[in-house]
């Protein structure tokens, strides 16, 4: 029987799907940064174990975490959700999570490639795309490192960000960018499932080459689409398949990766 993907978002801190519900845990899980400040990596790892056991017990087989963006300052948008701004620390966290979570039947999703980096907290991702204007090599030499560690450790999935990486692809958000997907495949070396972040939490149509964002997401190389209005996203993709915008070969490639993931994750 085909395995259904049942995902939750249990990062700890501001994003807790289960631990903030009465009857699951006595208290919400702390954010990884809080755990790190209290007990270092050992504290983070202990909290990770508790999260995964909770998800597994509740019947989930995917966690939309960990956040492995590098955030060095409290005025950066991912500061409260990330563990640290230190490359080595975040890389170790990504590696540990992959090695611990997945053998216990819960796939992780490394997020948000290529990273929100220095984007300030004042940037509101609910009103449109935000721009990272750092040099491409600066991003590759720092922000890619945690993703490489998680991928090398066997991470099944990676989530793309809704950031415009100005020096790599100024016309698309990462989730809609063929160039950023190529970076993830070729430079990071990831061959697993790529998914979008939520595609309709803002209007990203200006970055979709005149297409519907869900359609451009498939064309860019995503295998799974996250959308609150999933019916609209589905119908947009179906229309694009029927009119030839999305080819059968592209669909088969994405489906093959998803099916391979399901087989591996069983």
Where are these regions (language model features)?
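Glycine-rich, aromatic-flanked loop segments that form ligand/cofactor-binding clefts
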Residues: 1-25, 47-69, 90-115
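Second-shell residues forming the walls of enzyme active-site clefts
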Residues: 89-250, 257
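Active-site-proximal loop/short-helix segments
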Residues: 13-14, 20-21, 61-85, 111-129, ...
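Active-site cleft segment of glycoside hydrolase catalytic domains centered on the general acid/base Glu
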Residues: 37-44, 74-90
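A charged helix-plus-loop insertion that forms the helical arch/lid used to bind
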Residues: 21-38, 84
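Extended, intrinsically disordered, low-complexity segments
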Residues: 254-259, 263-264
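A short acidic, glycine-rich active-site loop
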Residues: 32-44, 133-139
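Aromatic- and glycine-enriched pocket-lining scaffold segments that form the walls
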Residues: 55-58, 76-79, 235
């Amino acid at each position: 029987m085909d395995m259904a993907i049942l995902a939750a978002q249990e990062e700890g801190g501001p994003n807790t799907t289960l631990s903030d519900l009465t009857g699951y845990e006595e208290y919400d899980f702390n954010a990884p940064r809080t755990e790190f400040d209290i007990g270092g990596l050992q504290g983070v790892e202990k909290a990770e174990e508790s999260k995964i056991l909770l998800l597994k017990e509740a019947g989930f087989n995917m966690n939309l975490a960990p956040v492995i963006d590098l955030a060095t300052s409290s005025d950066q948008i991912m500061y409260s959700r990330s563990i640290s701004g230190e490359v080595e620390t975040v890389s170790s966290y990504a590696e540990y999570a992959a090695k611990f979570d997945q053998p216990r039947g819960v796939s992780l999703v490394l997020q948000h490639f290529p990273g929100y980096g220095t984007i300030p907290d004042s940037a509101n991702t609910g009103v449109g795309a935000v721009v990272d204007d750092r040099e491409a090599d600066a991003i590759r030499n720092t922000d890619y490192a945690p993703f490489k560690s998680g991928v090398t450790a066997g991470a099944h999935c990676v989530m793309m960000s809704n950031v415009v990486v100005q020096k790599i692809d100024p016309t698309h958000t990462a989730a809609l960018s063929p160039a950023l997907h190529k970076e993830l495949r070729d430079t990071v070396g990831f061959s697993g499932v790529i998914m979008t972040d939520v595609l309709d939490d803002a209007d990203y149509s200006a970055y979709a080459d005149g297409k519907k964002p869900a359609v451009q997401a498939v064309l860019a190389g995503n295998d799974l689409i996250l959308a609150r209005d999933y019916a609209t996203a589905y119908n947009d993709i179906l229309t694009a398949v029927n009119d030839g915008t999305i080819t059968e070969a592209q669909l088969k490639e994405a489906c093959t990766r998803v099916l391979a993931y399901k087989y591996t994750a069983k």
